[in-house]
């Protein structure tokens, strides 16, 4: 049975790889709103107190002045989609930014802005030691024109992996790049 399953999976993988070499490319876009809504449902993030559960984290949109004060310059980056969410209570670390930018250069600019936010919060901007620790583990992930900043006390790695998987379906880029605090200003290949 294991041999059959291995053979079947190998055949499917080979067909998938051969199909990818067909020369035709289709632009697929990841619906970042749907992606965020799935995360919100899965992890208990709500925006409406009336329909939220007892354990839900109340989230809000960061727009206008709030967006600019948290991520200076991000509003000036050309984006096709931009979702920026933060908890209503600052002691809770659960900031999520998802963006599809106009170009890979725009995405790199957005990633740099988001990394600046991570660094500032980890170096004391978050005030509380536990919050600063969570921020020090935050990730900025870029895949082609897609970029995300994920700063959560729980589910950090899971969300980053889900984003990388979703973004890879929406871009023809060869691989994701991510940067964690402490890696300086250089990008490293994601494993």
What do these predicted regions represent?
Residues 22-24:
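Bacterial signal peptide processing site
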Residues 54-93, 105, 135:
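Short, compositionally biased low-complexity segments enriched in polar/charged residues
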Residues 88, 130-172:
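A short, solvent-exposed beta-edge/loop patch
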Residues 88-119:
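Mature extracytoplasmic domains of secretory-pathway proteins
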Residues 107-142:
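Short Gly/Thr-rich strand-loop-strand
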